[in-house]
From Swiss-Prot:
The name this protein goes by in its record: Large ribosomal subunit protein uL6
Function: This protein binds to the 23S rRNA, and is important in its secondary structure. It is located near the subunit interface in the base of the L7/L12 stalk, and near the tRNA binding site of the peptidyltransferase center.
GO molecular function, one term: structural constituent of ribosome
Assembly: Part of the 50S ribosomal subunit.
Keyword Ribonucleoprotein: yes
Residues spanning the signal sequence: none
Keywords: Ribonucleoprotein, Ribosomal protein, RNA-binding, rRNA-binding
The gene coding this protein: rplF
PANTHER family tied to this protein: 60S/50S RIBOSOMAL PROTEIN L6/L9 (PTHR11655), LARGE RIBOSOMAL SUBUNIT PROTEIN UL6M (PTHR11655:SF14)
Similarity comment text for this entry: Belongs to the universal ribosomal protein uL6 family.
TM annotation in the entry: none
One GO-annotated biological process of the protein: cytoplasmic translation
Length: 181
């Protein structure tokens, strides 16, 4: 049995969870998120606690079903946090002349190329640039926030010799020593 799926999720006040046969909808102060439910998983809501169980009785298939239940439980917890608090990722630009500027729904990046990069933001994502070298990405959907952060970082990932590039704020760049003559 999955240790993750065993622990129930307490639904905070102000969050409404609706479960149908194959779809879960979570509504909170930031909006609404939906998630599909695997057919072998049963989710029950008793006294504002969500518990997860499986419908499979065959011993061979139970391990996979419990893995699915654990994943569903983790994703549900992410949905609940997304509609109550939201998710955020912070990026920093390291390098001479590296700058970020937000203009409406477009993030303008100057990363040492001969041209500026204009990144169009997807729906449900907001970006702030408190300084020219910091980017804060916010949104309800954890996957979408992480995807946008990864796409922005991919324009110029940190290089190991000088450490220049776009880094996550808590990322440790492994530095290499320059070639000796």
């Amino acid at each position: 049995m999955s240790r993750v799926a065993k622990s129930p999720i307490t639904i905070p006040t102000g969050v409404e969870v609706t479960i149908t046969s194959n779809l879960m909808s979570v509504k909170g102060r930031f909006g609404q998120l939906n998630m599909s439910i695997h057919p072998c998983i049963v989710i029950t809501n008793t006294n504002n606690k969500l518990s997860f169980d499986i419908t499979i009785t065959e011993k061979k298939e139970q391990k996979k079903a419990w893995a699915q239940a654990g994943t569903a439980r983790a994703n549900t917890a992410n949905l609940i946090q997304g509609v109550t608090e939201g998710w955020e990722k912070k990026l920093t630009l390291i390098g001479v002349g590296y700058r970020a500027k937000v203009m409406e729904r477009v993030l303008n990046l100057t990363l040492g190329f001969s041209h500026p990069i204009n990144y169009k933001l997807p729906e449900g994502i907001t970006v702030e640039a408190p300084s020219q070298t910091e980017i804060i990405i916010k949104g309800m959907d954890k996957q979408k926030v992480g995807q946008v952060a990864a796409e922005i970082r991919a324009y110029h990932p940190p290089e190991p010799y000088k450490g220049k590039g776009v880094c996550y704020i808590d990322e440790q760049v492994v530095r290499k020593e320059a070639k000796k003559k």
